Amino acid sequence: MRALYGEISGQSLGGGGTITMQVVRNYVLSFERTYERKLKEIFLAWKLEDLLTKEEIFELYFNKAFLGNRNYGFAAAYQYYFGKDFSEATIAESALLAGILQTPSRVNPVRNPIASKKRRDLILRRMYNRDFISDEQLNLSLIHISEPTRLQQ
């Protein structure tokens, strides 16, 4: 709703809407900036939330999210950046990819490895603070060198 208010008021408030709205936009709608498209997006997002679980919506999102360097979806991005199958991802590598989501151009691990590592470390600390990872996993992940293979060549 914040983005819709911004459009109506003429102020850009940023933000791409909820994850469900982004799934609708990525799979169903165009990226044109019109009130009609935004209203369709909101309506379809409500419908989608009735049909799918949060986990199913997240899976759709992660399979189509833009992760820089022409990579869409975590599996493709992991293959591109690390040269391995996503099933082999470490916590540190997954956090690095998750860090790209917010601003792919600014935290691109190939073009800006320092910003990418800072963002990765922030995500790891948030994961720890929310009890998703243990103290040991945090410390091991912070020292893990999750440098993309693209930089090693």
Feature roles, as predicted:
Residues 1-3, 7:
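Conserved catalytic or metal-liganding residues and their short signature motifs at active sites
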Residues 10-142, 146:
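Non-catalytic, structured segments within soluble enzyme domains
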Residues 145-153:
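A short, hydrophobic C-terminal helix/tail in secreted or cell-surface proteins
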